[in-house]
């Protein structure tokens, strides 16, 4: 399932989307969401999912445009051995704001969740990431992981990461981690010695974050739209060749 939210680059306005999913026993859904809205848009996006026994939900999100983006994703892993895998990539610049709230509720036995987010903050951008793994009583053998990797390309950005693990069951495993930093001076020196300027280096590193998630999209036409929005039209075809 592909949801592509797009507009002209200079467009402004508000948009709100709510997606509800009920995965019955053994069902598998891959939900792909791409946000390519204009730089004056405020976008609110909410996902709610319920997974029954051995159901599997994969969520892939690319946040590339808009001024203010608010994301929410709550998945209840109700059935035994149900699973969630969420991958999010973002680029936030200017005075843009990105607010993310991801929740994995483990109710069934041997359920699994993996929530990963990675992106780049530029200029005066603000980003808040909240990731919650909630182990309910009875979720024996459940495993939950959350991780964020943020690259800061300005001293004026505001980055906030709030991981939370709630546990009402003993026989579970929960892990969280975050990597937040700037480009290493030695790496900058090396790349500059190879003929790249600072702007090119920052752009390359930003695109690497998006490309890592974009490659997980199986539809070539959708990947091409992402590259076009990023000003890299034709690179998808070249990479495939």
Which residue stretches match the model-derived regions?
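Extended amphipathic alpha-helical segments enriched in small hydrophobics
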Residues: 189-211
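Conserved beta-strand/loop scaffold segments within soluble protein domains that form the structured core
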Residues: 1-196, 217-241
């Amino acid at each position: 399932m592909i949801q592509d939210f797009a507009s002209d680059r200079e467009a402004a306005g508000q948009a709100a989307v709510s997606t509800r999913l009920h995965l019955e026993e053994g069902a598998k859904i891959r939900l792909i969401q791409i946000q390519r809205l204009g730089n004056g848009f405020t976008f609110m996006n909410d996902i709610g999912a319920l997974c029954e026994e051995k159901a599997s939900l994969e969520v892939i999100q690319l946040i590339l445009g808009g001024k203010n983006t608010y994301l929410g994703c709550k998945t209840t892993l109700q059935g035994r051995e149900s699973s969630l895998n969420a991958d999010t990539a973002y680029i936030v610049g200017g005075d843009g704001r990105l607010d993310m709230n991801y929740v994995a509720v483990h109710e069934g036995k041997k359920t699994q969740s993996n929530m990963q987010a990675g992106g780049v903050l530029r200029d005066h951008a603000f980003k808040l990431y909240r990731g919650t793994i909630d182990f309910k009583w009875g979720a024996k053998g459940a495993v939950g992981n959350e991780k964020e990797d943020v690259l800061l390309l300005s001293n004026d950005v505001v980055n906030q990461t709030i991981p939370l693990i709630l546990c009402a069951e003993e026989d579970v495993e929960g892990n969280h981690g975050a990597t937040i930093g700037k480009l290493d001076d030695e790496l900058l020196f090396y790349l500059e010695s190879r003929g790249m300027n600072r702007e090119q280096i920052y752009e390359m590193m930003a695109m690497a974050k998006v490309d890592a998630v974009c490659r997980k999209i199986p539809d070539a036409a959708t990947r091409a739209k992402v590259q076009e929005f990023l000003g890299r039209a034709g690179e998808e075809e070249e990479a495939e060749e």
